């Protein structure tokens, strides 16, 4: 993956946390990719690791008390629903789901029946002319990282060459409506803009609602979507027409399905985020999306080296993390 610059950080290769949960000679793997430091309401890597240690201790307590691992769908309720707990328990949940599917010798498609093939979403940036854009064949929408300010000549040329509609992602970088409207107007001269994503800070539904009336295109919220309560506020204020759901941010796969279903009930268009995940987690995202998301999402294959390619298995998610990746990883906690 090429690095993609956003307004607050350089989106490059993040540290990926893998968790292997083994019990009674059966195991499963989870994966999350926290950002290096806390930003826009999301926890940093160190915070997630601290929360994970507590989550594993909690998992051990529950297992000792009940005599078996909790069902994967219960895991999210074991945490405190904080930003850091959401990511940590999402990691545990994925590992337990993988283990249960392996135990039952079934595939994820048996649990989440595919309804359609979810189109893919690519991510590029207007904030760094030195990094080439990489857009794979078949991409249906392009998320373009941006910030207030004028477009460079290179940025305009790249936008003009796009065949796909654009989603302008501000990553909470705007302060005023005119900053967003100026960028939208400039980009609209050379590309088709479908939506503007998260121009203002997390929780600021009032300013988003006002801006939505002036945009002329859909407004989407990403960092501001963490629970069904957030959806209720978004719908109440008419703050967005679209939402991006990220499984780790909302506390795992079970919560993600609940959030997606509620968003649809509220008439919101939903897409699944997950720019940083490895091919392993992308496979899980794809299974989730194919069962309940029709908007272009982060579900395409990720270009990695042969040593990083996941290993094919017959059940569960159809793959597991590459042995080489796990061998080279630093062990943080062993339960």
Question: What are these regions, as identified by a protein language model?
Answer:
Residues 21-22, 27-104:
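Metal- or metallocofactor-binding catalytic centers and their adjacent structured scaffolds
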């Amino acid at each position: 993956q090429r690095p993609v610059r956003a307004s607050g950080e350089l989106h490059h290769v993040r540290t990926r946390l893998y968790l292997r949960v083994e019990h009674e000679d059966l195991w499963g793997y989870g994966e999350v990719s926290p950002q290096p430091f806390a930003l826009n309401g999301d926890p940093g890597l160190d915070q997630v690791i601290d929360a994970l240690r507590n989550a594993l201790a909690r998992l051990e307590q529950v297992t000792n008390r009940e005599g078996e691992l909790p069902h994967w769908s219960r895991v999210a309720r074991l945490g405190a629903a904080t930003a850091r707990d959401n990511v940590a328990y999402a990691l545990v949940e994925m590992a337990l789901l993988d283990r249960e599917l392996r135990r039952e010798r079934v595939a994820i498609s048996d649990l989440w029946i595919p309804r359609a093939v979810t189109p893919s979403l690519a991510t590029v940036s207007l904030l760094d002319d030195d990094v080439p854009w990489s857009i794979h064949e078949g991409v249906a929408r392009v998320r373009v990282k941006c910030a207030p300010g004028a477009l460079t000549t290179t940025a305009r040329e790249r936008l003009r060459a796009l065949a796909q509609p654009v989603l302008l992602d501000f990553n909470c970088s705007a302060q005023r409506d005119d900053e967003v409207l100026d960028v939208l107007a400039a980009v609209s001269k050379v590309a088709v803009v479908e939506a503007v994503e998260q121009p203002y800070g997390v929780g600021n539904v009032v300013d988003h609602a006002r801006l939505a009336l002036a945009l002329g295109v859909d407004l989407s919220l990403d960092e501001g979507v963490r629970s069904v309560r957030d959806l209720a506020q978004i719908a109440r204020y008419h703050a967005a027409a679209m939402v991006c759901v990220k499984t780790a941010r909302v506390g795992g796969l079970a919560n993600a399905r609940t959030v997606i279903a509620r968003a649809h009930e509220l008439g919101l268009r939903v897409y699944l985020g997950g720019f940083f995940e490895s091919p392993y987690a992308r496979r899980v995202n794809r299974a989730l999306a194919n069962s309940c998301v029709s908007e272009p999402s982060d579900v395409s294959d990720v270009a990695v080296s042969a040593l990083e390619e996941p290993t094919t298995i017959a059940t569960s998610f159809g793959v597991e993390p590459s042995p080489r990746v796990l061998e080279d990883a630093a062990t943080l906690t062993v339960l």
